[in-house]
């Protein structure tokens, strides 16, 4: 005969935590009677064991018999919010041993009820866990175990599950809800330990001749284990302890399977196996001992994400007697992040144990600590080999940017190394990913100083672009550029990373006093490459050469003897210059303004004034046109 114990069976984390909490409280108060509000867990043997320690279960109806200062422990299944308020009013010493998974469901029910959602609980309406959850949404929840039990559904609904419910029930109910409701928020709150235990029992029950399910007859999860096993193995029995084992089993069956509910302690399982095998120890007991792994600080472990209880924490099944907790701070250094952005339920992760578990708290696992050493090695290699790395900016500080590498290692970027030019507001980089070079890696006794530069990479990129641009530029071609800088003598125009000078005299055929009168920084303009010296990296540009020289054929356009209309644009001591068209000015000599004596030009004319004048001279080669106002007046 062989006895096979299911790989996952017996106490779950929440149950063990509740029992351990009771025993620890008793150690702290050895002379006091301790009370639990209802049976601490669904296991009569454990409840009887607690009685021997002066830890007694009382019903809700007996709360009024308690006195101020009495110790009352909330059962692992949780209680209603109203019950907690009543206990507080009596000024009792309340110890909360509610399973963390159940507490999570209670908080969700309360939150979404306050936001206007109807709450639907997939589970047994008479189970204390479900009764407790319902109490966190004003006892208004819709409670069912199967889809066919639901009739009229509200349009806005939040769905949760009893932690020990069958997955098939959850799926059937959720399918109906999704099809009939307009707005659905659903949380699969079936405890992973329950699901794993059920799968393990199902697999084992298909392989054996006889199946034994150990646990309280009042335990919901144990009853479900029995139903699952019975479906696969007709020779399945449900017992509470070894005393209920039939005598014929050992002689009649050669392959016996054993599983146990979440409220069944190891000693009850061992007692049952011992009775069947008639040995002090056998392979299955050894398996139980070996399966109860030991952990130590710094130990590398691998596990599965079994639940994400908030934006800051998740639980990981590492094969230990309780799940480990993974905090956001142990995944990333960015406190503004959400742990859901890094892990999902079902993910397999690796980490290091950084805190051992206690009676009331699970062990803590860190992804950061496992990856930190590798991250430092990578950054050191990047520094030595001058390789690029990508960092994410966390915040701007006086003097630069604080960034993180792989959500673990702090890297500082000085303000002068962020861009090629000075940046006034560094806050615009918060949350951005930047590619940088490590320019300083200094290992100290207590920390490592790491400094990076983005400017150096930008310089390299700029140099590459400049070289490509210089290779492509040719004299007497037209390019598009951007005005980057203005001076009194011209404008600097950038063409694909190369700056060229647009002299003030090349902006227009007309007279330009200041470049800023015609252009502004940021303007996109077309320019003519007037001259280029690739060796000296000099580029002369022109806008006016994009248009025809207005002095060409000027004798034809402005024949001598004709009257022309122009605009006075500037004065000289010897006369006034009149613009005939952009780039073509004529001179009215002071002697040609009037028949009377003119001492000052500005006494007779004003800037911007339009005047008629006779063309008296045209010299295209010397770019001169002589005009006369007084000869117009003679006509």
UniProtKB/Swiss-Prot annotation:
Domain S1 motif: 298-373, 380-455, 476-544, 561-630
GO BP annotations listed: dimethylallyl diphosphate biosynthetic process; isopentenyl diphosphate biosynthetic process, methylerythritol 4-phosphate pathway; terpenoid biosynthetic process
Listed pathway(s): Isoprenoid biosynthesis; dimethylallyl diphosphate biosynthesis; dimethylallyl diphosphate from (2E)-4-hydroxy-3-methylbutenyl diphosphate: step 1/1; Isoprenoid biosynthesis; isopentenyl diphosphate biosynthesis via DXP pathway; isopentenyl diphosphate from 1-deoxy-D-xylulose 5-phosphate: step 6/6
Required cofactor(s): [4Fe-4S] cluster
Entry EC number(s): 1.17.7.4
Residues that bind (2E)-4-hydroxy-3-methylbut-2-enyl diphosphate: 42, 77, 127, 163, 219-221, 263
Gene3D superfamilies linked: 3.40.50.11270, 4-hydroxy-3-methylbut-2-enyl diphosphate reductase, catalytic domain, Nucleic acid-binding proteins
Stated name of the protein: 4-hydroxy-3-methylbut-2-enyl diphosphate reductase
